[in-house]
Amino acid sequence: MRPYIVCHMMASVDGRIDCAMTEQIESGDEYYEALAELGCPSLLMGRVTMQLHYAAAEPFVAKEPAPIGRQAVHVARRAGGYLVAVDTHGSLCWPAGEFDGQPLLVITSEKCAAEYLDMLAGAGISWIAVGEERIDLPEA
């Protein structure tokens, strides 16, 4: 069975996703209760959200920026669910390879530096490089 994606997000009335704004909402745990009821085995978050909540403050800067230039996959750990980070160019550094009991899986484009992907593999983090210019999520 092909997996499907459920978009469970908070946004402002004007449609912007503003992480600073959502942290000021004092409405209880409705968002997280609804998320738990969905029963999704994996969670996918974008670069900005991951940077705010999980990644290290300093970005990754490749000494050798040569891109991987092809579709590739590295499975560091098989699991029933993952915390998935969408990081097109490979800029997030990770203090750990697991968060909230789920292993991390990073999805990048094929323009991502091979050095970044080597760093992830060395840290025991799974990754997928897919999409020439930008991430090809259906292919991932």
Which positions does each model-derived feature cover?
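A short alpha->loop->secondary-structure connector
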Residues: 101-104, 124
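Hydrophobic/aromatic beta-strand patches that form the interior of the parallel beta-sheet core
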Residues: 44, 84, 105-107, 128
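N-terminal nucleotide/polyanion-binding subdomain common to many enzyme families
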Residues: 1-99
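A glycine-rich beta-strand to alpha-helix segment
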Residues: 111-140
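Short, structured patches in soluble enzyme cores that scaffold and shape functional sites
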Residues: 9-11, 87, 108-110, 129-131
